[in-house]
Amino acid sequence: MIMAGKVMKKLTVSVASLALCALLLACPALAETSTRGAVTKLLIPRFVSLKTSEGNVRRGPSLTHRIDWILKLRNMPLQVVAEHGHWRKVLDFEGAGGWIHYSLLSGARTVMIKKDTVDILDRPLPDSAINARLQRNVLAWLSACELEWCEITADGYKGWAPKAALWGVSAEELFE
């Protein structure tokens, strides 16, 4: 009888695990939003920006780890993919990653233009008037995002850009 109880528990756990896996596969957005950082309890992954004009990116989460490179673009968007104590593992817009101290990061939202050229439009409509044309790797401030469009400001120009042309905002993100 004890054996049957253990088998039943294992079967119940296995069925529950399969159901959870099926749910997460059917709803990728749910899988992404359900991950929280162990330290901050904020969503992982999430986007932040570099607070300073220089930031050391290290091989691991401590001062004893070697510096792999130095970020030199203030307000550069970064994606936090892990947390460990006062350290955040980040990826830049080219996919390079490493660990950076949390004090060098800001919650201010910025994006990089990831297409060769992007028209910044007056309204979030494809046939709207063009306010500016931005080139690849231009840094812009993020103000708001709708389903397919984000309002950005770069070099004094403000307008709407297709979300797919920006790095620093996730596809499902909406905010004002």
PLM regions and their residue ranges:
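Residue-identity detector for glutamine
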Residues: 9-11, 79, 135
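Beta-strand-rich domains and repeat architectures in extracellular enzymes and scaffolds
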Residues: 66-67
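Intrinsically disordered, low-complexity polar regions and short flexible loop motifs
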Residues: 62
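Bacterial N-terminal signal peptides that target proteins for export
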Residues: 4-19
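SH3-family beta-barrel domains
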Residues: 31-59, 70-74, 81-84, 88-96, ...
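Short, low-complexity, intrinsically disordered N-terminal modules
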Residues: 1-4, 36
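N-terminal signal peptide c-region/cleavage motif recognized by signal peptidases
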Residues: 26-28
